[in-house]
């Protein structure tokens, strides 16, 4: 059976109940959102030689959609508890808490991750700031549920719809991570911005370049 791409909103026929917060995030586009955009007004632009911090996990929104729309198909391989947990990733879609904390903790730039996943988000952040970047693919945070469901559907988790995740830059990424963790928000430094235009990912010694998003 041909797999459908995730471009529609979550089906109301899904066997898993959608939360009010999730529906509101879908209405707002699951990006920074109007409230968060106001919060971040006046923020400095990312520059070279800054740490790159990622909040929570990539692929949250896409995983929630895939799990919610394909419960019965996924049950052929996975336990119900795992599918229900994946569908409940919608509870992580608001990025206002981490943006608010980041604004008080030395953040220089904030990029919402959404369409095209973390790969597109990193490229867009670097393009807008006019910088390059180097990042370690193994440090990019991803839930096991996302990996399993992406493998089932032949999706790339690094290109999966990723509302609920922010890319942030800071002169001291470790201090920003500490501030976020103190508020109960998972975060990790995955790399640094660089001078020049090369956007490079490293994976166990192998080097690859990020491409411009295809849309």
Segments and roles (model prediction):
Residues 1-66, 192:
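Glycine-rich anion-binding loops of enzyme active sites
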Residues 163-169:
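A short beta-alpha structural unit
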Residues 64-81:
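Short, compositionally biased
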